[in-house]
Amino acid sequence: MKRFIVLALCMLMVLETTKGLDFHNKDVESENSLWELYERWRSHHTVARSLEEKAKRFNVFKHNVKHIHETNKKDKSYKLKLNKFGDMTSEEFRRTYAGSNIKHHRMFQGEKKATKSFMYANVNTLPTSVDWRKNGAVTPVKNQGQCGSCWAFSTVVAVEGINQIRTKKLTSLSEQELVDCDTNQNQGCNGGLMDLAFEFIKEKGGLTSELVYPYKASDETCDTNKENAPVVSIDGHEDVPKNSEDDLMKAVANQPVSVAIDAGGSDFQFYSEGVFTGRCGTELNHGVAVVGYGTTIDGTKYWIVKNSWGEEWGEKGYIRMQRGIRHKEGLCGIAMEASYPLKNSNTNPSRLSLDSLKDEL
């Protein structure tokens, strides 16, 4: 078990069905053109502001637009786009959507101990690229909404993946069950840890489906009838050795892996496409899942990361993050807190309890 809880507030991210707004050189040439762009942006994303607030937010918006514009003119491997967060400062974004208090948990619980077991330690031959989406082991991108449940989404991606690998059946599982019922140490919309969620699933005998226990984006009372109708079980979990992208690669070559990252930077805030190489630290504040890796034509290595902010953010809900950097923690700390579920067979819980629940519904 990890020595501290990741994601106290997680990323309370909400994305509308609208996509990012395109703009051009003429839109940033003058104060008037920027104001017109701001009004278009507000209409595009249905953002209501008072007259007083508009004046304040317009200055923030100008700063962000210019940052996006200047960044996209540079020879970078990724692009930014003006999205829902166009008039939020970088600090507001970090405070609201990346507000995890990880240092407190580190000091309180101490550094985690060395990994006891890593089943892929002796794997020496790896494919040059892996994409579990192409292998049918990844469900469509989901949206956590205004709830700090990224830890639950990260957990579910990994469990859905290993279940499909073992059974050849892809089942969308319930994040809401984790939010409502895994509350002994995890804290629902106020954050949690993937390792604890894996152990909860193991101890409860499995996790039910999203169809049976749909997502509400809020803390609700645990529905024990639904909780007692598991459809997918696991046998525990293991941690990837800390600060080793090589070991993370070994794990991802065999199954999707839950990871924590620092997602609070402005470039992450406005990421749209390409291999992300932007500035970020190791203040882990968001749970995501690595579902593959690869290399671009020009030789840039990357991780394929599934997010939980809907398909409108990034590359249809995904971000490619640079892999193999010189810092041992990996870009944005991606190699610091990786773990994956264990499933030793192709069997799952009996459908009797699920069928009984469906009869009641």
Swiss-Prot record:
Its main location: endoplasmic reticulum. PANTHER family: CYSTEINE PROTEASE FAMILY C1-RELATED. Residues 21-125 form a propeptide. InterPro entries: Papain-like_cys_pep_sf, Pept_asp_AS, Pept_cys_AS, Pept_his_AS, Peptidase_C1A, Peptidase_C1A_C, Peptidase_C1A_papain-like, Prot_inhib_I29. Gene3D superfamilies: Cysteine proteinases. A motif (Prevents secretion from ER) lies at residues 358-361. Pfam families: Inhibitor_I29 (PF08246), Peptidase_C1 (PF00112). Residues 1-20 form the signal peptide. Disruption phenotype: Reduced male fertility due to impaired pollen development and abnormal pollen exine. Enhanced susceptibility to powdery mildew caused by the biotrophic ascomycete Erysiphe cruciferarum. GO terms for cellular component: endoplasmic reticulum; plant-type cell wall; plant-type vacuole. Belongs to the peptidase C1 family. The active site is at C150, H286, N307. Disulfide bonds join C147-C189, C181-C222, C280-C332. Its EC number is 3.4.22.-. The keyword Transmembrane helix does not apply. Expressed in roots, stems, flowers, buds and green siliques. Found within columella, lateral root cap cells, and in the endodermis, the cortex and the epidermis during lateral root formation. Expressed in the abscission zones of the flower organs. This is KDEL-tailed cysteine endopeptidase CEP1. Possesses protease activity in vitro. Involved in the final stage of developmental programmed cell death and in intercalation of new cells. Cleaves extensins, thus probably supporting the final cell collapse. During the compatible interaction with the biotrophic powdery mildew fungus Erysiphe cruciferarum, involved in the control of late epidermal cell death that limits growth and susceptibility to the parasite. During anther development, involved in tapetal programmed cell death (PCD), leading to degeneration of tapetal cells and functional pollen formation. GO terms for molecular function: cysteine-type endopeptidase activity. Keywords: Disulfide bond, Endoplasmic reticulum, Hydrolase, Plant defense, Protease, Signal, Thiol protease, Vacuole, Zymogen. The keyword Protease applies. It is an enzyme of class 3 (hydrolase). GO terms for biological process: anther wall tapetum development; defense response to fungus; plant-type hypersensitive response; pollen development; programmed cell death involved in cell development; proteolysis. Inhibited by leupeptin and the cysteine protease inhibitor E64 (L-trans-epoxysuccinyl-leucylamide-(4-guanido)-butane).
